[in-house]
Amino acid sequence: MIQPQTHLNVADNSGARELMCIRIIGASNRRYAHIGDVIVAVIKEAVPNMPLERSEVVRAVIVRTCKELKRDNGMIIRYDDNAAVVIDQEGNPKGTRIFGAIARELRQLNFTKIVSLAPEVL
C-alpha cells in the first residue's frame, strides 16, 4: 500500500536510488497504490553523473510492496521493501537492468519489457 509521501527504493539502474510518491495515476481520489500501479514520484536520492537528477519528477511503476499481495489461488506474497521502476511516457523502463524479484502480475498489466529484464519473477 503506497500513498503520497511514501519513500520507495528504485529497482533499476536509471540513476535514481530513492523516490517519494506524490500522486497515484488513475482515479482522482485513489488513496493507495499496489503492485502494478503507476505513480508520479520525485527523486529524493540519485547517483552522481547520471541522466536522472535529484528533485526531478518522474513516473514509476510499483514492482514490490511490503503489504501482502493475495492471488486467486490463495498464495500470499510479501516483499521486504517497497520498490518501483522508473518508466517513460510509453511505459518502457528508463534503465537497462532490473534488480530483485518482481511479481507475475506485471505481465498481465502489459509491462512485459520490465518482466523480461527482471532476474526473477514470482
Swiss-Prot record:
Pfam families: Ribosomal_L14. GO terms for cellular component: chloroplast; cytosolic large ribosomal subunit. Gene3D superfamilies: Ribosomal protein L14. Its main location: plastid. SUPFAM superfamilies: Ribosomal protein L14 (SSF50193). It is found in: Plastid, Chloroplast. Keywords: Chloroplast, Plastid, Ribonucleoprotein, Ribosomal protein, RNA-binding, rRNA-binding. PANTHER family: 50S/60S RIBOSOMAL PROTEIN L14/L23 (PTHR11761), LARGE RIBOSOMAL SUBUNIT PROTEIN UL14M (PTHR11761:SF3). Binds to 23S rRNA. Part of the 50S ribosomal subunit. Belongs to the universal ribosomal protein uL14 family. This is Large ribosomal subunit protein uL14c.
